[in-house]
Amino acid sequence: MKSKLKLHGFNNLTKTLSFNIYDICYAETPEDLQAYVQYIDEEYDAERLTQILTDVVDIIGANILNIARQDYDPQGASVTILISEQPVTPTDSQIEESPGPLPDTILAHLDKSHITVHTYPEIHPVDGIATFRVDIDVSTCGVISPLKALNYLIHQFDSDIVTVDYRVRGFTRDIEGRKHFIDHEINSIQNYLSDDTREAYQMTDVNVYQENLFHTKMLLKDFELENYLFGDATRNLSAEQREQVTERLRHEMLEIFYARNMPH
């Protein structure tokens, strides 16, 4: 075990985890598309999001100071939680490069600054495709990385595509006055994901180590069409229609994953 870094004063490093989660579906009729948006809007309303973020606060061991939440018309929701700092002696499991807990195994000890979430349901005007995007930011100041919340959050949403960014900014000084621009080892965000998550997703990294900037994109490997169909009308799709819908959905997912429009 490595000896702990002795600091002069408080740890001033800011660690920010930002990620976007996308859920994709297909509906045959305009009415079913609107029903999907309504379903998502109710399933992930401000109250549900508040509970999810409260669980994140538990995972990172923070104290809630204030919660601001809002449901929007016609759809969407947002929640911001301010969290307080207090002196903490982190355990080895909190600072090592390893996966955080799953939804059914939440345990925690950390303390930090703010968490926000916003939701964005949207539908394609002609192709029957609907997407639901969740943007989450977890920003902490101090010794423990917000990456410990990543594993839990991916399991809380139906995540077809996930884009994750992690950065460390600022510096802290040791007792000899030497600056430290990062206080933990990290080679890849993937090391904070559980084995089942790594096996389920195709992943690619773009990391700028000298800038303490890490980026991982994730695309679900297994594609079961039944998991992407919404509404009663989709039950009557012919084999040819099912093949066409599969192509549309995969094309949509690849465009989101690569962040560019692609030819059909």
Curated annotation (Swiss-Prot):
Active-site positions on this chain: 113 (schiff-base intermediate with substrate), 118 (proton acceptor), 141 (proton donor)
Biological processes annotated in GO: spermidine biosynthetic process
Catalytic activities: S-adenosyl-L-methionine + H(+) = S-adenosyl 3-(methylsulfanyl)propylamine + CO2
Post-translational modification note: Is synthesized initially as an inactive proenzyme. Formation of the active enzyme involves a self-maturation process in which the active site pyruvoyl group is generated from an internal serine residue via an autocatalytic post-translational modification. Two non-identical subunits are generated from the proenzyme in this reaction, and the pyruvate is formed at the N-terminus of the alpha chain, which is derived from the carboxyl end of the proenzyme.
Site (Cleavage (non-hydrolytic)): 112-113
Protein's pathway: Amine and polyamine biosynthesis; S-adenosylmethioninamine biosynthesis; S-adenosylmethioninamine from S-adenosyl-L-methionine: step 1/1
Family: Belongs to the prokaryotic AdoMetDC family. Type 2 subfamily.
PANTHER family: S-ADENOSYLMETHIONINE DECARBOXYLASE PROENZYME (PTHR33866:SF1)
Gene of this entry: speD
Cofactor note: Binds 1 pyruvoyl group covalently per subunit.
UniProt enzyme class: lyase
Cofactor(s) this protein cannot do without: pyruvate
Pfam families cross-referenced by the UniProt entry: AdoMet_dc (PF02675)
Keyword Transmembrane (UniProt): no
Cellular component, GO, one term: cytosol
Cross-referenced InterPro entries: AdoMetDC_fam_prok (IPR003826), S-AdoMet_deCO2ase_bac (IPR009165), S-AdoMet_deCO2ase_core (IPR016067)
Keywords, comma-separated and alphabetical: Autocatalytic cleavage, Decarboxylase, Lyase, Polyamine biosynthesis, Pyruvate, S-adenosyl-L-methionine, Schiff base, Spermidine biosynthesis, Zymogen
GO molecular-function term, one example from the UniProt record: adenosylmethionine decarboxylase activity
UniProt superkingdom: Bacteria
Protein name: S-adenosylmethionine decarboxylase proenzyme
Free-text function comment from the UniProt entry: Catalyzes the decarboxylation of S-adenosylmethionine to S-adenosylmethioninamine (dcAdoMet), the propylamine donor required for the synthesis of the polyamines spermine and spermidine from the diamine putrescine.
Gene3D superfamilies: S-adenosylmethionine decarboxylase
HAMAP family in the cross-refs: AdoMetDC_2
EC number per UniProt: 4.1.1.50
Subunit structure: Heterooctamer of four alpha and four beta chains arranged as a tetramer of alpha/beta heterodimers.
Residues recorded with modification Pyruvic acid (Ser): 113
